[in-house]
């Protein structure tokens, strides 16, 4: 599937690929992720983002999607059919143990931040995920009334992400 980010393509599977969210910025980060490692072997793959039943791939500008999309789809399909785990069990356990929606932990979160997290989870995250990305609450500054979030996957570096995020929150 195309995403709003022209450098990212989203590949959706009809079954679970990973039970948690994983973002790999390079092959070194993918040492326990056989699927991501395989994708990074291609010279045009810049980043790999996996969540539930999809893989979002960010490419370098050295190739056009029309030239590489079928090859990527086939690699993902063959990997899925092999029955291998996309990410090793140790990494899955480690990722599941992390707080899924925020960089903050329990007692550090004030009531306003909790409300913001709830809004992000219920209204923003599903829309962002449908575009092949993720949003994670980072902080809220009560003095300036500014919310800081981290965009991952297709949303990271997307030229329209600021507008889309602002528009989505306001609506």
Regions found by a protein language model. Name each.
Residues 1-171:
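Domain-level signature for proteins that mediate thiol-based redox and metal-cofactor handling
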């Amino acid at each position: 599937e195309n995403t709003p980010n022209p450098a990212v393509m989203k590949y959706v599977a009809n079954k679970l690929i990973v039970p948690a969210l994983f973002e790999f910025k390079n092959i070194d980060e993918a040492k326990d992720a056989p699927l991501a490692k395989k994708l990074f072997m291609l010279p045009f793959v810049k980043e790999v983002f996996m969540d539930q039943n999809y893989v979002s791939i960010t490419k370098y500008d050295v190739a056009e999607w029309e030239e590489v999309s079928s090859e990527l789809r086939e690699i993902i399909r063959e990997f899925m059919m092999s029955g291998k785990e996309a990410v090793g069990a140790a990494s899955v356990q480690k990722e599941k143990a992390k707080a899924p929606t925020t960089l903050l932990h329990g007692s550090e979160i004030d009531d306003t931040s909790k409300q913001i997290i709830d809004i992000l989870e219920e209204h923003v995250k599903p829309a962002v995920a449908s575009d092949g990305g993720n949003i994670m609450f980072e902080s809220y500054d009560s003095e300036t009334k500014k919310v800081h979030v981290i965009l991952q996957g297709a949303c990271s570096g997307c030229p329209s992400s600021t507008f889309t995020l602002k528009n989505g929150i306001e609506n």
